[in-house]
């Protein structure tokens, strides 16, 4: 909008932390001196034939407007951003179980859903930050569908701690090549220095340190589960350990 000549008066985010990617905040807001107001929301709009202004107010920890903080801003346009959720009408019509966190199908490392022969990929599986991830998952789903026709399956579940917003895939098929399984995850909240830990049957087998984790920024990692030694009915579990102050 700024590049097209509009004057953007501000961005109002109801959450106490930004929902956008860090790079987008810097490139789209900071670089153009557009203010970001956290813990604020639009509570009223003004105008008859067209918009003449809006009312904004601070919100509390429960996203409820705080009385007495209202202010009117004169403007002629309001853009409301409500985020994204995967579109899965087709999957639901086929009875494919969905993950309550991703809003997409529960899948294994080859992106097959819990209904044999049905695969999911891209933003139908979970909302991706980059189109590169969408393309990669589409290629994997295609290869996996071709492999599925001639093989049986032996699956184990992948579980996560409450510090995760979600992690994909949710299952691993031991009959497949699991030497380079790509996993995607988001934290449930903003975290400082922390460690993502993988345990198999209660023993730590892998970990990675992160300076911080933010829910808007999806993380990607690739692991060799073949070398990590997943047995029949293994307990495969990821958790996040936050560094103590």
Where are these predicted regions, by residue range?
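A Rossmann-like FAD-binding core segment of flavoenzymes
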Residues: 2-89, 179-212
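Short, aromatic- and glycine-rich surface loops/edge beta-strands on solvent-exposed regions
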Residues: 196-198, 226-245
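A conserved FAD-binding loop/helix module that cradles the flavin
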Residues: 121-169, 242-244
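FAD-site-proximal beta/loop scaffold in flavoenzymes
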Residues: 77-128
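Surface beta-strand/loop "capping" patches
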Residues: 153-191
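Conserved mixed alpha/beta catalytic, RNA-binding, or beta-rich assembly cores of soluble enzyme
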Residues: 98-100, 137, 152, 196, ...
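A short alpha-helix-loop-beta-strand transition element characteristic
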Residues: 5-10, 97-100, 153
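Exposed aromatic-hydrophobic patches
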Residues: 184, 216-228
């Amino acid at each position: 909008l700024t590049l097209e000549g509009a004057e953007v008066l501000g961005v109002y985010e109801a959450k106490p932390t930004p929902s956008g990617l860090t790079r987008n905040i810097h490139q789209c807001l900071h670089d153009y001196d557009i203010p970001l107001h956290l813990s604020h929301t639009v509570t009223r709009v003004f105008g008859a034939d067209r918009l003449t202004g809006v009312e904004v107010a601070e919100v509390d920890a429960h996203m409820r407007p705080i009385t007495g903080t209202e202010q009117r801003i004169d403007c002629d346009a309001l853009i409301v951003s409500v985020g994204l959720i995967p579109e899965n009408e087709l999957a639901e019509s086929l009875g494919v179980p969905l993950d309550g966190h991703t809003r997409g199908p529960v899948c294994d490392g080859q992106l097959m859903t819990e209904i044999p022969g049905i695969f999911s990929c891209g933003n139908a599986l979970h909302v991706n930050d980059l189109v590169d991830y969408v393309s990669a998952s589409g290629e994997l789903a295609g290869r996996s569908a071709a492999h599925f026709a001639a093989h049986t399956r032996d699956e184990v579940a992948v579980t996560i701690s409450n510090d995760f917003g979600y992690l994909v895939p949710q299952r691993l098929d031991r009959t497949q090549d699991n030497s380079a399984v790509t996993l995607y995850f988001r934290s449930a909240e903003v975290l400082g220095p922390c460690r993502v830990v993988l345990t198999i049957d209660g023993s730590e087998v892998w970990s990675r340190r992160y300076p911080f984790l933010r829910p808007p920024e999806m993380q990607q990692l690739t692991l060799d589960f073949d070398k990590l030694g997943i047995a029949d009915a293994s307990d495969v579990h990821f958790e996040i350990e936050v560094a103590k102050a």
